[in-house]
Amino acid sequence: DRLRSRGLGDVYKRQVLLPCIGLMEHMVELLFPDDGSAAEEQEMDRLEERFLQHPALSIEQSRLVTNSMAERAEGNLLMAVGLRNRWSDKDFRMVGETESVIDRYEDKLGTYLMKITSKSLSQSQSEEVSKYLHTISDFERISDHALNISEAAKEIHDKDLQFSPEACHELDVIESAVREILSVAVGAFVENDPQRAARVEPLEEIIDGLCDEMKSHHVDRLQSGSCTLNQGFVFNDLLTNYERVADHCSNIAVAIIELESDSFDTHEYLNSVRAMKSSSFARYYEEYKQEYHL
């Protein structure tokens, strides 16, 4: 009887309790959320109205909050990219929740920075505020693309889509390049490092080239029948989002570099960089070309 009771208990655990574990975990998360929301509130509390009477202080608080926003956007993108190879319901939900948090960062920062611009600012202070106003939308858009990428990964998971080995290799390469450009751009922003920011544009061009090459290979696979239309739609969605993330990283780098030259003429800057092909640009381009190729 004891053995029979134990056997029935094992069956109960397998058939009744195990399927409920995921639901129970989700309920615990809802009842006892992590300290992410508390950390967000703590960050937002830096943007106090009374600091607006002291521009140096309000700008410094804005810098700290924008840096936090940048790092959250980077973390969200990395989490989303990781879902393609390692699916997790929890991480998928976290990407969506973090995207909402970053939306609130943009709203609060944008409003606060505009209030700062109405104060009497020195030229350097005005330029710093302009830098933040130029970049918070890029960080928000990067997080938007993280959400898009997570939804593409969910489609891959839900439909059990299997890419060809060639397509998987290509995605691994471009995802590695996107991780790198994001790390460089966010690091350059947080450290206010124009020299590091100068590495972004060469890598952005490499990523553009990879996307073009991958799209061409994708058409070949469709024609040969080694790739289906369903796989193709998701593949193209991923490429589009990776390419746009790189574009936003380029915008961030431009804001950092142009702050040093007292100008925000993005078009002029990019044209001059690409036309001159400075020694550092060419060196970084060749370095990344060797590292990221199909």
Residue ranges of predicted features:
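Positively charged, low-complexity/disordered segments
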Residues: 1-3, 7-8
